[in-house]
Structures are given as C-alpha cells and as structure tokens.
Amino acid sequence: MKIRVLKQAFLAFVAMAFAATSSLAATATDPVLAEVTTGEWRSADEKSRDAARKPIENLQFWGLKPGASILEVQPGAGWWTRILAPYAARTGGRYSATAADLANPSITEAARKGRADFAARFADEKIYGKVELVNWGATAAPLAANSYDFILLSRVIHGWMRVEGLLDRHFANLAGSLKPGGVLAIEQHRENPGPQDPMAESGYVTEAFVIEAAERTGLRLAARSEINANPKDTKDHPFGVWTLPPTRITVPYGSGKAPDPNFDRSKYDAIGESDRMTLRFVKAIP
C-alpha cells in the first residue's frame, strides 16, 4: 500500500514537472524580441500601448523567426515598424514596408511627402538596419514573387473594401510575394458574426469575411487566437472604431470638422482599444 502511494506521488510529481516545463517552453520569449520592444527608440506613448496590443505575444503566435524577410503593409506611423525593423536588423533578416507608389503618375504631393517622411523617420541604420520601401497602391506593379517569410497586415483591411476589386487584388499580390511556407499575419478590428457591411464603414470586419478573402488566394488558415480580444467592445460607437483609443475622434471620421469639446469620451475610453481578430495564414509548400 505504502509503495503504491509513493509511486502515485512520484508519477504526480513527474507529471507536474513536465507540465511546468512545457508551460515555460510555450511562453519562453525570444530574447531579441524582448530587447527591441523595450528599446529606447520607442516612445513612452508607444510602449504604453503594449498592454493592449501585446507585441511579443502576437509576434510569437504569428511565428516570426530570426533572420526572416519581413514585409509590413501600410505601416502608418510605424508602431510595429519600431519593433520589426530592429528585430530584422539584429537577427540577420530584412525589413521592408509598403509606401506610396512613386511610379504612379497621379501620385499626390501629400503621398510623396508621407513616403519621404517615413523613410527619414527610420533612416538610422544602427537601430533599424536598412529599411526598404516598396511601391504599393491600386495601380502599383506586383510585389516580387516568393520574396517574404513574414507579412503583417495590421488593421488595414477595412480600407481596401471601399474600392471595388482592391481587396482581392491586394490579397493575391501578397500571397504571390510570400515564400512557400511563409506567414501572412493579420490583426484586424473584428465585427460580430453575421452579414458584412461591404464598405466596412465602422472599421470592423467579420472573421469569416477575412478568412474567405485570404483563402481565395490559396493561403491556408493555420491558427487563430484571442490574444487581442476585448469583450468590452460593443462595436456600436457613434464614429465607428475610431471613437475608441487611440484615435478617439469626436466627430465623423474624415468629415474635416473640428473636434467636439462637449463629446463625453469616458464611456469609450473605458472600453479601451478595439476587439481584434488575430489570424495566421500559411502559404503551401509545393
């Protein structure tokens, strides 16, 4: 009896030890990723959003690896850029970002300036390595085929839905530019399941819509995560997702109106950043 009890206790100990080891392995952080997320080149404001945006958890879920060739699509002000470019530089990888199409004869001066400003902001090669900008837009030439290990789409898909045919064009372009086995990582404001507004006026898109669009190109949904879920997000805000932090608008988006000083923001600030889907697609290896 005593021997059986001791044996059971020993087996329980081994099981707990194995579980603890497995848990640690599953949550072990890439040391370079940890380093670049705390880099002094990231502002205090950018770092303050880490609790909501969870950069390390997301990038590890998506499967970012040292030495990867990375493409960030429509990087905006560069919140992800200040993590991805230094990571690529420190691991022997390559970082590229899409930018205004300089080959477009109709390019506006504002678009040209935006591209130049982005390039200047990330020109320090000691921090960011060599940042490559690639032409992108409705009429841009296709990206180089089989060029990237990792492509990030962060909260941009809703904008593509407002131009007929653009969504499918962009997804096909990105799928073609992925190397076999490469990852398309998606973070997008998430609408509740149901019919999709074809124009995505609120900024929210259903998971089913995004998955179908990506899979039309032959990409395979490898995993989805609730890392960026926010159950407090009711998704019925007066000015769409942009009512929430960090944009926090108080008048209709793009209206050109002055901010409304009497708009009560407290309810929306309490919600925090949007509820977002987190998806990982993989390109098949022939």
How should these model regions be labeled?
Residues 263-286:
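C-terminal lobe and adjacent flexible extensions of AdoMet/dcAdoMet transferase-like proteins
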